[in-house]
Amino acid sequence: MKKIKVLCVDDSALVRGLMTEIINSHPDMEVVATAPDPLVARELIKKHNPDVLTLDVEMPRMDGLDFLEKLMRLRPMPVVMVSSLTERGGEITLRALELGAIDFVTKPKLGIRDGLIEYSEVIADKIRAASRARLRALAPASHAAPLRLRSPFASSEKLVIVGASTGGTEAIREVLQPLPADSPAILITQHMLAGFTRSFAQRLDALCAVTVREASDGERVLPGHVYLAPGGETHMRLGRSGANYVIGLQASEPVNRHRPSVDVLFHSAAEAAGGNAIGVILTGMGKDGAAGLLAMKRAGARTMAQDEASCVVFGMPREAIALGAADEVVPLADISERILTRLGDRGHRV
């Protein structure tokens, strides 16, 4: 079996050693080299031609983001960022994902050895997914305002329910940016750790006509608003309070190894919204959301899955399609328009 070749770049010798220990403990991957900074890494990339790079975001001699941007322009390769769990770390990590990084893992604030070893399976899963990921070309920065679509109508009854994982931060941005301010309410579960979703919501809010926020327990769901499940600690559910939709956040065990889980949100939407919802499953590894999307379809919702060609990782959509949960398979660039088209359809389903 061919092993996944990994190059670890981090200014901390402790982190380099721990990452090497963790990665080499899995039989399908190995660390071929480590580097204390991007300048050393540049030479090691030429020498070893690694399959995946793990990259610290803050390092001496060259900033991790600067190096990532140069790398994705000149020698694109799968990168998993290693970030500190701070507000600044969250903002930098989101920028790294925009620049083309596949995913990220966090350094624990205290007890770094125990924290990273506890993350062993997560780190290995992310490296495996990165090794199979479809790289996005880094487009030149554009300052033009995004083209806004027109909503066929505004209704407090209609809802869009979205789930995503690896590659999802950029996919979600691409879905939300064209939507008009009077779009129906949108609920999103993106696999993300605590401490990152608030920064992600703020970044999206600045880019989109719709209002984007991190969801709060018990809040009423309003048209023109996007509610992002908080990372790490709870599952997000859709419920009813009289004539209104409301959000529930529940601290319970992970589902499909994830918290928040897409399946939890989708199953709750099937029960609370039925045929008034549209379910969308985007890029991501694993199967979270597939069964929930099928439940939504059976409850009368329109459902769609992102197509393989536009996915960073075609895991969750593939599982949903295999179950027969997706009414249609749609390229990422067309999903916003398809959502609005479905909202305008007449019949027993949105």
UniProtKB/Swiss-Prot annotation:
Assigned EC number: 3.1.1.61, 3.5.1.44
Domain CheB-type methylesterase: start-end pairs: 152-346
Major enzyme class: hydrolase
Keyword Phosphoprotein tagged: yes
SMART domains noted in UniProt: REC
InterPro entries noted in UniProt: CheB-like, CheB_C, CheY-like_superfamily, Sig_transdc_resp-reg_Me-estase, Sig_transdc_resp-reg_receiver
UniProt GO MF annotations: phosphorelay response regulator activity; protein-glutamate methylesterase activity; protein-glutamine glutaminase activity
Any single GO BP term: chemotaxis
GO CC annotations on file: cytoplasm
UniProt-listed NCBIfam families: PRK00742.1, PRK12555.1
Notes on the domains: Contains a C-terminal catalytic domain, and an N-terminal region which modulates catalytic activity.
Stated name of the protein: Protein-glutamate methylesterase/protein-glutamine glutaminase
Species for this entry: Bordetella pertussis (strain Tohama I / ATCC BAA-589 / NCTC 13251)
Lineage, broadest ranks: Bacteria, Pseudomonadati, Pseudomonadota, Betaproteobacteria, Burkholderiales
